[in-house]
Amino acid sequence: VISERRHVACQSLVLSLALSLLGVAHAADKKPTNDKLPDWAPKPKPHVIEDRFRLEVMTLSANLDTDIRIDPNLATQGTLINAEDDLGLDDSKLLPLVELTLLPGDRHLIRLSGFSVRRSADQVIDKTIVFDDQTYLPGERVNSTLNLTSFGLTYGYSVVKTQRIDLALTFGVQIVEIEANALVRSRVVRDSETGVTPLPLAGIEGRFDFNDRWSFEGRVQYLSVELDEVDGSVLDARAALTWRMNPYLVFGLGYRDFHVKVDSRDIDDPGIFDMKMAGPLLFMRASL
């Protein structure tokens, strides 16, 4: 009898252990995974933070090349001059640049950008220059100023968005203001011109993540327009290698090329302005 009781007890113990193991296995099967988390569970951190706000501060070591011609009228052309060679303006400059990007959705971006190039020089010219309705003679000392200010508004939509690739089409407008001034103090000869031109842009930009830290970014915007009185074109391109310190802070080293050309046949401001600006770029981007 005792043997039978021990046998029954052993059978009960084995059955209880088996049921316990089945329960544990069943619970393990129902354990949530990262790809099937309940709504209340915290989601895993993304490969790159899905931010909604970016502030980018840049320094551009720009090489500058500027051709300019201000005509007295539509029938008479002025002198085409190179601002760096003929007027002595700086052909290189360290420029601060700022961009603010808003990301209202998973695939949308709105970017505000702007920069200013301000240069002045005092040089004795070696040729006759017709600038608007003034004539500057060889041997005269000319005080010149040439300023360019650019503001841009861009909208982008990501047509391809994966874990490592983000490719967007962009549309925007670049407002370019040009201010030119030339002064000969000995003859009290002075002329000043200002022009503002809005230029629409279309482009493409993208990012490829090599890993959690390193990425390659590139963008290009370009458009050429021909209106009744003004022809213009803008090219704004850049490429950069970036290093992500943490999900909120990125450092980058790249190259930027900016080229604006305006050919005006407007009766009030006829002439040509052609400026190329290119050089290495260092930037820091903060994300929130």
Language-model regions, residue ranges each:
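Transmembrane beta-barrel strands of outer-membrane/channel proteins
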Residues: 57-61, 112-116, 169-175, 206, ...
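Short glycine/proline- and aromatic-enriched beta-strand/turn motifs that initiate or cap beta-hairpins
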Residues: 28-117, 281-287
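Transmembrane beta-barrel architecture of outer-membrane proteins
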Residues: 52, 93-97, 148-152, 197-201, ...
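Bacterial N-terminal signal peptides
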Residues: 12-21
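Repeated loop/turn-to-beta-strand initiation elements of outer-membrane beta-barrel proteins
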Residues: 107-110, 163-165, 212-216, 247-251
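Detector for outer-membrane/organellar transmembrane beta-barrel domains
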Residues: 166-168, 175-179, 187-224
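Residues on the lipid-exposed face of transmembrane beta-strands in outer-membrane beta-barrel proteins
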Residues: 57, 98-102, 153-157, 171-173, ...
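Extracellular/periplasm-exposed beta-strand and loop segments of Gram-negative cell-envelope proteins
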Residues: 65-93, 116-148, 176-196, 225-229, ...
